[in-house]
A protein has these predicted regions:
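S-adenosyl-L-methionine
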Residues: 6, 11-143
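Acceptor-substrate binding/catalytic loop of class I
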Residues: 121-125, 378-389, 418-435
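Conserved S-adenosyl-L-methionine
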Residues: 130, 136-210, 305-330, 337-340, ...
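Conserved phosphoryl-transfer catalytic core
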Residues: 181-251, 255-256, 363-377
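SAM-dependent nucleic-acid methyltransferase catalytic core
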Residues: 244-340, 345-351
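Conserved beta-strand signature within the Rossmann-like core of class I S-adenosyl-L-methionine
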Residues: 368, 406-412
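A short glycine-rich, Lys/Arg-flanked "PGG" loop and its adjoining helix->strand segment in the class I
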Residues: 389-404
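Core SAM-dependent methyltransferase catalytic element
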Residues: 403, 461-474
């Protein structure tokens, strides 16, 4: 009789036959979620990607139950207590203009817990982070209330908004004046006085006429961009880098609209509506502005209802205009964590995307194009070479300001087929942008500790995969 390690083969076969059905049933009845998470933790709906499950698992291991309730990104309930993330995201999803496509409406409905909640839904921005993902990343980086997180390329301010809600101090830097302005409005909208905004909506026509008088009316459906002399909106920008009404009479606005936070809220809604009108003639510019202001008010009311009584827990945040290659932060080793996404320079021309609004704010777009990372250079190859040089400087600055042992997270997309055409080499020989950044970080003491990946939707022709790259400072 054949024997295996002293046991008859026939006996081993009988054991397998007798135990296998029971084991399979037991394994399948538990499922992956039950195997990974404690029974008292309930995941949020719509969690359906591997990277989300990974981040949720890390949250469950790194955070206490109290921290999950306060700041968790992927859990709806801890025991009998609903999490703040679930409460902020619950209810009616973000309101969209009536002419919005069914695809866009479906996106917000099926991604209610990922994006569009809090004030992230103000002013849609191409290439923006998933806010829920950023909240999860902040948690797995070990950042706690009172710490400071930096986004050196803040874009629409997702990192700053999430950090503020989590009680984590934040600093954001961007070369674009419009990004700085947009981010500040989204931050202020968490606590903006609502009564004056409601009054402005009731008197929407006078508010609209005020901005038309100040800045000019968009050329509806023309897709033409205004020049710097098209309006006078840029003159409201004062020396303190705030936006306050100066060129037109304040009496033209409803009561309370002169409050800077309220005024900026209305201004962003106007710019948002003007941008829509420039791209589409489905609605008149006024009707577009009215619909967007109504949506903005809904967003602010919804998040402030959840935050009522907890306003003191919101952390300090600073949105700055500046250069990531030479950060406006003097103190070295003063930042507890860094999160940023390099510009998708080969996928999105951010200045073309924002030129309507930048012109309204009086920005010299040609000058800005020569300064922005990813847009410098004439040919695609030259752009890529300058991009590599610039990103090395950015990582050097990140290493300078980051405390030793802390983490710098880079969220970056890549498309090797596209890069192979630019560099004129086979796709198999091309390094992805994620690999390039890991190499650039090593000489500055930034070492890879984890990399997660996710598929990108909506940018399939340019970026197919996005990586979450976690680098630790030596």
């Amino acid at each position: 009789m054949k024997r295996t390690h002293g046991r008859p083969v026939s006996l081993i076969k009988e054991e397998k036959m007798s135990y296998q059905p029971e084991n399979i049933t037991d394994i399948l009845s538990r499922g992956v979620r039950e195997s990974l998470f404690s029974k008292h933790l309930e995941l949020v709906p719509q969690l359906n990607e591997v990277y989300e499950l990974e981040l949720a698992y890390y949250e469950s291991k790194i955070l206490t139950d109290e921290e999950i309730i306060r700041n968790g990104a992927y859990f709806a309930r801890v025991g009998n207590t609903l999490t703040r993330h679930f409460l902020v995201c619950s209810g009616e999803p973000v309101r969209l203009p009536q002419h919005s496509s069914s695809r866009l409406r479906s996106f917000f409905q099926t991604n209610q817990f990922k994006t569009g909640y809090a004030t992230h839904g103000l002013f849609p921005y191409r290439g923006k982070f998933h806010p829920q993902m950023i909240k999860g990343v902040i948690n797995v980086m070990g950042l706690k209330p009172g710490d400071t997180v930096l986004d050196p390329m803040m874009g629409s301010g997702t990192v700053l908004i999430e950090a503020k809600l989590m009680g984590i101090k934040s600093v954001g830097v961007d070369a674009s004046p419009f990004c700085r302005f947009m981010t500040q409005v989204k931050l202020d909208a968490l606590t903006v006085p609502l009564t004056p905004v409601r009054e402005a909506l009731k008197n929407c026509r006078s508010v609209y006429d005020y901005f038309v008088k100040l800045a000019g009316q968009p050329n509806q459906g023309s897709k033409k961009r205004f020049g710097r002399d098209s309006g006078d909106l840029f003159s409201i920008r004062d020396s303190g880098d705030k936006y306050v009404p100066r060129s037109a009479s304040r009496v033209d606005l409803p009561w309370g609209s002169e409050i800077p936070e309220v005024y900026n809220f209305l201004l962003l809604a106007y710019l948002d509506g003007a941008g829509y009108s420039e791209r589409s003639d489905r609605k008149s510019p006024y009707d577009q502005f009215h619909a967007i202001l109504e949506r903005y008010l809904f967003v602010a009311e919804k998040v402030q209802l959840v935050l009522a009584g907890a306003e003191s827990e919101l952390a300090e945040s600073k949105a700055l205009e500046g250069d990531a290659r030479c950060l406006p932060i003097q103190d070295s080793s003063s930042i507890d964590g860094i999160i940023f996404s390099p510009p998708y320079s080969f996928a999105i021309d951010y200045l073309e995307n924002d030129s309507f609004h930048l012109n309204f704010l009086g920005t010299d777009i040609d000058r800005l194009r020569e300064e922005m990372i990813g847009l410098r250079g004439r040919t695609l190859r030259q752009k890529f070479e300058l991009y590599e040089t610039d990103m090395e400087k950015v990582l050097s600055e990140c290493a300078r300001v980051l405390r030793p042992g802390r983490i710098c997270t880079i969220v970056v997309g890549t498309n090797k087929n596209q890069l192979s055409k630019i560099l004129e080499v086979p796709p198999g020989e091309v390094k992805g942008i994620d690999e390039l950044l890991v190499e650039l970080g090593k000489p500055h003491g930034l070492n890879l500790i984890r990399k997660l990946s996710r598929q990108i939707t909506g940018m399939a022709n340019t970026m197919r995969t996005e990586f979450i790259v976690l680098l630790q400072r030596r």
